[in-house]
Amino acid sequence: WDVMLCVSGTAIACENALVVAIICYSPALRTPMFVLVGSLATADLLAGLGLILNFVFQYVIRSETVSLLTVGFLVASFAASVSSLLAITVDRYLSLYNALTYYSERTVLCIHTMLAGAKKLCLGLLPVLGWNCLRDRTACSVVRPLTKSNVTLLSTSFFLIFLIMLHLYIEICKIICRHAHQIALQQHFLTASHYVATKKGVSTLAIILGTFGASWLPFAIYCVVGDPEYPSVYTYATLLPATYNSMINPIIYAYRNQEIQRSMWMLFCGCFQFKVSFRSRSPSDV
């Protein structure tokens, strides 16, 4: 299981390092929307590196201090990844719901994102600062050396974020359907292309939220109901799918974007000149 987590971490690190490099390489991608995508890729990149370091320190350098640092690093990285997903969801919702005041509200969103990042950093430091079960084995959770209260706090935070994202994506779907209906009224009928576009948009949102929930919900639920006496295979079996979310994120939020695809080709094939001008997409684009 540790080898599988290490392999997963390597794949996550490689995928997201490429996204970060592409966004840093192309000036056309240095827009607020892509900054959020870049922050998500950076968090997932750090999570992948954390999985690799965890494997190395488990089998090469065994130390309680190093173990705590690695666990804290992983907690902060994955928490930052989930928070970045929430920030992207809020950004897309605001771009659709309040299009006229969107750019003024973006500043507030950026401030909240930075505050959330500071909070996740604090969550990662808690095990290092003493909130661990190294001295009291009875307080251990299914994720050693985190305590039961620690993982309960993390799981509760995840459930809250998941519910907020679920609510926002439902509202986004309503807005999409409402816009399609308004277009149909203006044109006196709903064309096949509008129907297909609406159906595709709703399906994509369902896939995004479904992937996120399927990846993290089993692990979050097991952290709450699991007992440290249970076989560790249960922990690994629920943790591994959670890491897959960081592997899927760059595919959903980056590689499917046409601007990033063009920048990727320019990064690898700098000799080619693209005549297509770069246009910053609306953050509501999925």
Task: Say what each PLM segment does.
Residues 1-26:
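First transmembrane helix
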Residues 174-219:
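Intracellular effector-coupling site of seven-transmembrane GPCRs
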Residues 5, 9, 46-61, 78, ...:
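Helix-to-loop junction signature of class
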Residues 164-165, 211-224, 236-286:
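Seventh transmembrane helix
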